[in-house]
């Protein structure tokens, strides 16, 4: 991100207030993009640590960045069901009613944000003209171990606090992130809500293949290697199941740095 800090807007979605910003300028009709971040992150955290840089997108698009329910500046409640991926997809559609009510948008997501986009897109595909699915999360049978870890993490926070959870979940980043000074984005969920957020993630999975096969939205899948939390198996599944989807895999930091311009080019194609 560059330039002065963006103004924070809020939109009421059910019983939550979602915080969002906008940057860039739509050069013509239909040039709005929306960024959906990963679990426990926030609208700008992944860019702040240098993981992504969406400035190429903002040169020709109005880019909406928003904090998911319970994350960053957005509010949320204690019910884990609020944080399931289908419900986060409904939140996103509600936000689109406010930020782009009359035109479809380009959706760009990361991990939980990728899942959010997919649930929104299978529900209302006409709301999107492009999908960019970065670092898809675990899914299906591969997800089982992570479900156990999410539930155990929620219990640990309630029993021993956030610091204990952070220590237990610390680990080396994948090699593709080795060039970053700190590849771990700070947890942007209040400690009081984090157990609910994790339990919501534990209840979640991607849409069924039959729903994904029905999508007719140009889709780019961006994955990196060496990360069990974002396995190539999910990325390959999405690229196989979604009609016409393209897959690009980054194995090195240099390849990762090519993603932002690649996304801008994909949206312009």
Sequence positions of predicted segments:
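Catalytic active-site module of serine/aspartate enzymes centered on a nucleophile-bearing elbow/loop
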Residues: 244-269
């Amino acid at each position: 991100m560059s330039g002065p800090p963006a103004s924070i807007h809020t939109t009421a979605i059910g019983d939550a207030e979602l915080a969002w910003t906008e940057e860039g300028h739509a050069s013509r009709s239909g040039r709005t993009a929306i960024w959906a971040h990963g679990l426990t992150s926030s609208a700008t955290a992944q860019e702040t640590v240098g993981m992504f840089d969406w400035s190429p997108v903002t040169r020709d698009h109005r880019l909406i960045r928003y904090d998911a329910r319970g994350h960053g500046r957005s509010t949320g409640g204690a019910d884990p069901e609020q944080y399931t991926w289908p419900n986060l997809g409904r939140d996103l559609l509600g936000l689109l009613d406010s930020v782009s009510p009359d035109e479809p948008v380009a959706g760009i997501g990361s991990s939980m944000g990728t899942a959010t986009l997919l649930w929104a897109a299978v529900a209302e595909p006409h709301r999107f003209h492009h999908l960019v699915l970065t670092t898809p999360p675990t899914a299906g049978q591969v997800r089982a171990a992570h479900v156990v870890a999410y539930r155990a993490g929620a219990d640990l926070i309630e029993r021993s606090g956030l610091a204990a959870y952070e220590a237990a979940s610390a680990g080396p980043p994948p090699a593709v992130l080795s060039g970053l000074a700190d590849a771990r984005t700070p947890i942007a969920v209040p400690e009081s809500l984090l157990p609910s957020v994790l339990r919501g993630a534990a209840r979640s999975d991607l849409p069924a293949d039959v729903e994904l096969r029905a999508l007719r939205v140009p889709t780019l899948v961006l994955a990196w290697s060496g990360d069990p939390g974002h396995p190539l198996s999910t990325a390959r599944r999405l690229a196989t199941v979604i009609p016409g989807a393209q897959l690009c895999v980054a194995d090195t930091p240099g390849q990762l740095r090519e993603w932002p311009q690649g996304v801008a080019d994909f949206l312009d194609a």
